[in-house]
Amino acid sequence: MEKNDVTLRHLLDLCRKSRKAGAWQYSAFISPAEQEDLLRSPEAAGFDFRLTGGCENAERKIQAAGSEADFGPPDPPIRAVGVEPKSVKYAEQLSHRDYLGAVLGLGIERSVIGDICIRGTRCLIFCLPSAAELLVSSLAQVRRTSVTAALTDADVPEFQPEYRPLRLNVASERLDAVTAAFAGISRGQADRLFAAEKVFVNGRTVTDRSFRLKEGDVLSVRGFGKAVYDGIDHETRKNRYCVRLRKLV
C-alpha cells in the first residue's frame, strides 16, 4: 500500500473517531500531496474537518477532525519555536535544509515538524508540543553555527509570507510553458526538469508537460522557487497569454 493511501486511511479514521468520541481529533503534519488526497476523497466529504499549519499559507498542515458547531473552537496542538544564532556576527547563511537536518539529527520525526520559515539569521519552526520541548532543550547548533531555541508567538510579522507579483508571457497555461517562463529557461531545458522530476504542483511531482494549471495552484520548481498561480491576466495581440503568479520570496 502506498504511503499516501495509509495516511488517507488514518485521516479518515480520525474523522470517525471524532464523531464517535464527540471531541476534536488531531493528526500529525501532512504534506500538500496528502492534503490534496484528503480533500479529493469522496469519503472525506461526509466528515467535518479543517487543515491548519499554524501560520498563513502554511504548506505542511495538521488535520483537525471535528465540528466547531458541536465541539466549540478547535485548539490545534501547534507550537512555534524561534531559533537564532548566539552571535549574529559569526552566523552562517543557513538554509531550510540546514535547519531540517539539525532538527532530524535530534531524532525528531518529520511528521511532527511543520513549516520552517527563515528570515535573515532567524528561523521559526512550527511543530507539535513533543518536538517543541526537545528543540528548546536540545537544539544548540545548526551546521557550525551555535544557536538558541525558545517558544515564541507564531504571529510574528517578519515571518509572514512575502510574495513578489510576476506577469509572464506564455503560449498557453500548459505546465511546461509556464515552468519555462517562470524559471527563465527554454522549453528544452524545462523538459529536462520534468524528466528529473523537479517540477511540483501542490506538493506533488508532475511529469505531464501538458498539465494545465488552475487558479490557486502552487507551482514549485526545484532550484528556481515557488509561486502561486493566479490565472490569465489577458490575451496578447499575438494570441499569447499574460499570466499572473505570486512568487514566494
Task: Give residue spans per PLM region.
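Ferredoxin-like alpha/beta domains used as RNA- or RNAP-binding modules
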Residues: 1-176, 182, 205, 212, ...
